[in-house]
């Protein structure tokens, strides 16, 4: 058992840490609410764009590159990580999944290109001497479409130029406050479901100019929207996991404070008992 001074010092430092983690928990909770609201507000836009694609692509046998599968000679991996830690296993889970999938496919560095969001992911691959084709650090906690536009444009350009034949996004999918799932989903080429699962409310309309020209405009916009919507979802997951991590840290700190307080009281009681014993012993010796 440590001295009273040591125990008291630990109690004070733990209380300060507890205050910090509680504050971070509250901040993460506020950011989570905003992230969920942003994601919900963006969904109607994607639904309308989905309907437009359904109406156009559903009435034509389009050979648009974004709708046609081709032999995969090189894959694109768009990895969404965070710019800072203290979010539990948020980064470790998704980065481990990327490496695992690459290894299971037996891919060499020449078989894929990495696009990485977040400093943690960028440093992760850099420390392993794995080349990153495009890096986007400092992603805002509440990203706007403009703030992530560089990476969406880069991903689409790589696909349209034939530098990659498939684009996959790796992210932590937000399920609820207590659960997130490391997820990989293919974005390009768009699946038949992506091109035909809308409501098709514009199917009775005539389109000007021709449908292929319209697809050339709205398909890239739709892919940009898919990427942006995924980033919004990943941000919600990040805030939720950080909120949970900080709550757990606060709970652990409270438990530690209780244990240290018990140790302090016992040590103080032992010291008092020792002093009384010494006084009694001294008095007895004087008799």
Curated annotation (Swiss-Prot):
Q: List the disulfide bonds.
A: none
**Which CDD domains does the entry link to?**
F1-ATPase_gamma
How does the protein associate with the membrane?
Peripheral membrane protein
Origin: domain of life: Bacteria
| Subcellular location as annotated | Cell membrane
**Which Pfam family, any one of them, does this sequence belong to?**
ATP-synt
UniProt GO BP: proton motive force-driven plasma membrane ATP synthesis
Gene Ontology MF annotations: ATP binding; proton-transporting ATP synthase activity, rotational mechanism
What keywords sit in the KW lines? ATP synthesis, Cell membrane, CF(1), Hydrogen ion transport, Ion transport, Membrane, Transport
Q: What is its main location?
A: membrane
* Record family assignment: Belongs to the ATPase gamma chain family.
Q: What does this gene product do?
A: Produces ATP from ADP in the presence of a proton gradient across the membrane. The gamma chain is believed to be important in regulating ATPase activity and the flow of protons through the CF(0) complex.
Name this polypeptide is given:
ATP synthase gamma chain
List the source organism: Staphylococcus carnosus (strain TM300)
């Amino acid at each position: 058992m440590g001295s009273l001074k040591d125990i008291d010092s630990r109690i004070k430092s733990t209380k300060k840490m507890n205050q910090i983690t509680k504050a971070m928990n509250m901040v993460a909770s506020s950011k989570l609410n905003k992230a969920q609201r942003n994601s919900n507000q963006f969904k109607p836009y994607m639904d309308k764009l989905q309907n437009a694609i359904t109406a156009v692509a559903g009435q034509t046998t389009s050979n648009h590159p974004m709708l046609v599968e081709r032999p995969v000679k090189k894959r694109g991996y768009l990895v969404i990580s965070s710019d800072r830690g203290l979010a539990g296993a948020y980064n470790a889970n998704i980065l481990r999944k990327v490496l695992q999938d690459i290894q299971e496919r037996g891919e060499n560095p020449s078989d894929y290109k990495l696009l990485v969001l977040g400093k943690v992911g960028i440093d992760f691959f850099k420390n392993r001497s794995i080349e990153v084709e495009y890096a986007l650090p400092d992603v805002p906690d509440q990203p706007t479409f403009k703030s992530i536009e560089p990476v969406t444009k880069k991903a689409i350009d790589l696909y349209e130029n034939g530098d990659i034949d498939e684009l996959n996004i790796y992210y932590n999918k937000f399920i609820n406050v207590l659960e997130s799932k490391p997820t990989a989903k293919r974005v390009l080429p768009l699946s038949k479901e992506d091109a035909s699962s809308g409501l098709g409310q514009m199917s009775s309309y005539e389109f000007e100019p021709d449908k292929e020209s319209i697809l050339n405009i709205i398909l890239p916009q739709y892919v940009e929207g898919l990427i942006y919507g995924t980033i919004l979802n990943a941000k919600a997951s990040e805030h939720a996991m950080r909120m949970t991590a900080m709550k757990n840290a606060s709970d652990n700190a409270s438990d530690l404070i209780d244990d240290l307080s018990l140790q302090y009281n016992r040590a103080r009681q032992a010291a008092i008992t020792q002093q009384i014993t010494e006084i009694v012993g001294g008095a007895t010796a004087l008799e």
